[in-house]
A protein has these predicted regions:
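Membrane-interacting alpha-helical segments
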Residues: 1-8, 12-22
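Active-site and donor-binding regions of nucleotide-sugar-utilizing enzymes
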Residues: 17-203
Length: 203
């Protein structure tokens, strides 16, 4: 199943310049920053990097208090925040800390996710809500970087879709080192999908 996914995501990668052009016209992408999705990076500081990823505004807002606390930790040199939308990048600018750096999440190809991980070398990767990316998870696991799913949310509809993928879903969710969710239904779904370490907490 991972092979099929990689074929599909590579096809998306091939046509992605066309998609980007349309998004630029609609002002949903930054002309100066869209290349980050192809792994053109911001400057990295030497030291410990913690990484947070959220799809858009809501997900990022939900972890701002946590991120602000982490900025006070002297052991952490840089906090990388990735997202998928232009609007979320504006929210991140409101966090007043020199430790914060924002990047757009790379297209989930095997090559780009590998390149991303090798460049940033995060100590831990925090994914917010229901952000599950097969190639990124596979390569984080291969690099032995802990994956933590925070404020996890899996709906009944999403659960049914993942269950159809059976072994692929179990492998993918098995890569997650810790799932945090205050939603009992989500915890139950995650358990059935293959997640092993679960905590009924919400950040």
């Amino acid at each position: 199943m991972l092979i099929i996914y990689r074929l599909l995501i590579n096809l998306i990668f091939i046509i992605s310049p066309i998609i980007i052009i349309f998004r630029l016209i609609k002002k949903k992408e930054s002309f100066l920053r869209f290349k980050e999705k192809y792994c053109f990076f911001s400057k990295k500081k030497i030291g410990k990097v913690i990484w947070f990823h959220g799809a858009s505004v809501g997900e990022i807002k939900s972890v701002i208090p946590l991120i602000e606390k982490i900025t006070k930790d002297k052991k952490i040199t840089q906090i990388l925040i990735t997202s998928n939308t232009l609007s979320s990048s504006k929210i991140i600018k409101s966090i007043k800390s020199k430790k914060i750096v924002h990047q757009f999440f790379p297209i989930d190809t095997n090559y780009l996710t590998n390149r991303f991980i090798k460049y940033w070398k995060p100590t831990a990767a925090f994914f917010i809500d229901s952000e599950i990316w097969p190639n990124m998870f596979f390569n984080l696991n291969k690099a032995k970087i802990p994956i933590i799913l925070i404020n996890a949310r899996i709906t009944k509809k999403t659960f049914r879709k993942w269950r159809k993928l059976n072994e692929f879903a179990k492998t993918l969710f098995g890569y997650i080192d810790l799932c945090l969710s205050s939603n009992k239904e989500t915890i139950n779904y995650l358990k059935k999908l293959g997640s092993k370490k679960l905590d009924t907490s919400e950040i």
